[in-house]
Amino acid sequence: HNSCLNCEATVTVGKRNGLTVVPGMELCTAEDAHTICLFPTVADAMEFHQYVKQHSPVMNNDAGTFGTQIIMNDSDEPIGEETQLLINAANIGIDDVVALVNQYHGAAFPAHIDRSAYSVFSTLGAIPPEANFKAAEITHYADEVCLLREHAELRDKILLRNSDAHYLEHMLEPNAWLALPECTPECLIAALNGEIDITWK
């Protein structure tokens, strides 16, 4: 969370294997609501990373308690360590995220909204209209029909079903597809910003 330091290696490995990787960050907002921030390039992602770092509490990571925050290269080898603790909330309000991420040519949407912790619903009870999100992420456990019934603000948003996996073995098998004019980060970001019409099934 709150870091893009492994984006470059991940994008490089993706290119090597014929995969389109979209660099991004799972931001923890001031409200403790996790938010996905995606960018067209690693350079944009790293500029945003620096902004978030400058607007986060300066606190050293306790590796014994929270684990080592390892930076990897594209050969899956450790090349460094982030010493600033990354799990804390950044001093960035949820109402400001979309406009801020747009400044770095990206798109943002609330993460795992159906989870009982660190989601916009668990912390705020609803998605603030001022936040101007065009999409939202739900987990594979979510009852989409129930969510749409209970939260009217979701009915005009793209709902992306993801695993919220922190380990490879927890990643879902693909069960949905997104029809984009081009298989590029730029095209996905345009769709998530509501700039082009898409089909998501």
Predicted regions and their residues:
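Short low-complexity stretches enriched in small and charged residues
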Residues: 59-68, 88-95, 112-118, 133
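Internal catalytic-core helix/loop-beta-alpha segment
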Residues: 78, 82-114
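Charged catalytic cores and adjacent phosphate/nucleic-acid-binding surfaces used
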Residues: 4-46, 99, 104-107, 113-201
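Active-site gating loops and adjacent loop-to-helix segments of metal-dependent hydrolytic enzymes
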Residues: 39-83, 126
